[in-house]
Amino acid sequence: MESTLGLEIIEVVEQAAIASAKWMGMGEKDTADQVAVEAMRERMNQIHMRGRIVIGEGERDDAPMLYIGEEVGICTREDAKAYCNPDELIEIDIAVDPCEGTNLVANGQPGSMAVLAISEKGGLFHAPDYYMKKLAAPPAAKGKVDIRKSATENIKILSECLNRSPEELVIIVMDRPRHKDLIKEIRATGARVRLISDGDVSAAICAAFAGTNIHALMGIGAAPEGVISAAAMRCLGGHFQGQLIYDPADVNTPESADWNREENIKRLKSMGVEDPDKVYEAEELASGETVLFAACGITPGTLMEGVRLFHGGARTQSLVISSQSMTARFVDTIHMWDNPQNIQL
């Protein structure tokens, strides 16, 4: 899979990032997202594969493109037999977020990127559109920290694993009212908190790389993005756990005010989630034999530069990670269109 699709998926996220970057700082988050969706879908449909969106822009009735269940790739066309040999057909599941951090793009803030994860059919967890409690940490802490433990306990373990004092640790938390007590607890240990408005996939990945000065991600975010984060962390050997959140009291958002705890439990069970309280490991959320993850910076971030547009072209920086070869490749690309001038270095 890596040898046949590795370069292709880089180009998919590059095209989505470039399209979205053209709307950076324009205050139009929906447009920045929509153009990324269109560009990602168009490039996917040029790939020799039979792909199925398992995490995308929403249910079919709510999303015209890259909706859950949509099939993409040349081998999904009606005339597929003319292009695809059934014996060589690659059937894959795909999780996408064409513009992770739409508000970041709209406001010209750092940390947004186009991301996707792929695996063979059945290799990615079909996360319901709920919230998820998440814990991401470096490979050195894998299997030692635990989402069921308190933040205080996990920071103590993390400190020991990384041979750092708590004061030398930085924990990423989404800047949400629901995290008020979590932030207070983290700070009480001496660890420092970096608040982010959006983009917890990027934050989770940063925790796996030494030198980012990010040592863990804690708190509650969207479940679909949790699967994408898990795919990346599985490839990197980092620690990731997720637990679905169904109680409105844990989320504390305007939309959760209409939630009913018992109804949410029933809905999750109807979707195949036998134990709504189950803690999922990265290897369960991304269970495929082969998992590939790709991301391209839209605005500048800790790991990657954002898209840099110049007359007649653009320069992008991407990351592709593979569980097959256990590699993380940073790809710096100059895209030259019509009569490029002043090529960006």
UniProtKB/Swiss-Prot annotation:
Pfam families in the cross-refs: FBPase_glpX
Annotated residues for binding of Mn(2+) 2: 97, 100, 225
Binding annotation for substrate: 100-102, 131, 176-178, 198-200
Cofactor: Mn(2+)
Pathway: Carbohydrate biosynthesis; Calvin cycle
Enzyme Commission number(s): 3.1.3.11, 3.1.3.37
GO terms, molecular function: fructose 1,6-bisphosphate 1-phosphatase activity; metal ion binding; sedoheptulose-bisphosphatase activity
Record has Manganese as a keyword: yes
GO biological process: one example: glycerol metabolic process
Reactions catalysed, as given in the entry: beta-D-fructose 1,6-bisphosphate + H2O = beta-D-fructose 6-phosphate + phosphate; D-sedoheptulose 1,7-bisphosphate + H2O = D-sedoheptulose 7-phosphate + phosphate
A cellular component term, taken from the record's GO annotations: cytosol
Binding site for Mn(2+) 1: 33, 57
Residues annotated as transmembrane: none
UniProt KW keywords: Calvin cycle, Carbohydrate metabolism, Hydrolase, Manganese, Metal-binding
InterPro entries xrefs: FBPase_class-2/SBPase (IPR004464)
Functional note: Catalyzes the hydrolysis of fructose 1,6-bisphosphate (Fru 1,6-P2) and sedoheptulose 1,7-bisphosphate (Sed 1,7-P2) to fructose 6-phosphate and sedoheptulose 7-phosphate, respectively.
PANTHER family per UniProt: FRUCTOSE-1,6-BISPHOSPHATASE 1 CLASS 2-RELATED, FRUCTOSE-1,6-BISPHOSPHATASE CLASS 2
Subunit structure: Homotetramer.
Annotated family: Belongs to the FBPase class 2 family.
Name under which the protein is recorded: D-fructose 1,6-bisphosphatase class 2/sedoheptulose 1,7-bisphosphatase
Organism: Picosynechococcus sp. (strain ATCC 27264 / PCC 7002 / PR-6)
UniProt lineage: Bacteria, Bacillati, Cyanobacteriota, Cyanophyceae, Oscillatoriophycideae
